[in-house]
Amino acid sequence: MTKKNNMYDLKKVRKDIDNIDNKIIELIGDRFKEIHKVTKLKESKDEIIDHERITHILKSVQSKAKRNKIDPEIIVRIWQIFIQEAIKLESSKIKK
């Protein structure tokens, strides 16, 4: 392959990555819209942190990461951030 072809391929792959990033951001936005709905369904701050649910989510994403040949530690760290941000959001919205 020539250098020119490599540059074209690199640009194409980067564009593909950018498109995937855009989809990921949209999906994260969708996830947080659902968290807003959950917030409206919870009646008290005692309901914000569900340790059983958190454990289930983290085990689930870890398993899915392994099946997709992705480092599960990376995925768990990302989901821990999602969970922390959801807890912050719920804490700020739930009054009781």
Regions found by a protein language model. Give the residues of each.
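Domain-level signature for soluble enzymes in the chorismate/prephenate branch of the shikimate pathway
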Residues: 1-96
